[in-house]
Amino acid sequence: YVFDMGINTAGVPRLEIKGERGTRIRLRHSEMLQKDGNIDQRNIDMHLRPRNKREIIQTDEYVLKGEGVETFIPPFTYHGFRYIELTSDRPLTVADVKLQTLRMHSDVAEVGRFKCSDQLLNTIFDICRNSYLSNLFGIPTDCPTREKNGWMADGFMVQEAGMFNYDSRNVYAKWVKDMIDTQEANGNVAGIAPTSRRWDSNWAGPLWDAAIFIVPSYLYRYTGDIETMRQVYPAAE
């Protein structure tokens, strides 16, 4: 079965299901569909190079206990998706299944809103806000599907728009500390914060490095946060 959850967002599914003990359920998540109506993960797994068949992406598995209606919410993960493909290794009917989307993002209060007489502009605004929240998980990320990394240029380019709409000052203040932690003895900072050091800092260049100056300056400009400026000054100097 393929379920359309109605909106492309970030979070996890909440599955209610009943079936025979030992039945293995697999949930695969995607942002797109193929022409035949099946899910399309090609925009997500294009760079995936698995070393074994269990290295899968955007996928959850659950084995039924066979004790009436069971509830499964995947722990320790989140996905970006609109569509969910449900498969099982034993017969099920759609009447046995209930799926919900539990949307997730950092807890930030709304502080701004926009509405006008042009519905197209209103829709674009809502899409942008949804995309912003879908990429706010303790740090601003590049996507909720594949890398989920704190790419520094991606993050600061949407910072102003985000702060006009949400009180995300704590997210950015924490992110600046992550940037400081990536700095090397020669002053270089990584293009991703926090970083696993998969790439060294020499490739990033000024567009990514600029985040260590721009993010705290926006925090000061829009919230008066002088403490983050004090913390980052030795690294930025």
Regions found by a protein language model. Give the residues of each.
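Short acidic-aromatic active-site loops that bind/stabilize oxyanions
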Residues: 118-125, 165, 202-206
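Short, charged/polar micro-motifs that form catalytic or ligand-binding hotspots
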Residues: 5, 74, 148, 162-165, ...
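Well-ordered alpha-helical scaffold segments within catalytic/enzyme domains
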Residues: 157-168, 211-228
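C-terminal PAP-associated
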Residues: 233-236
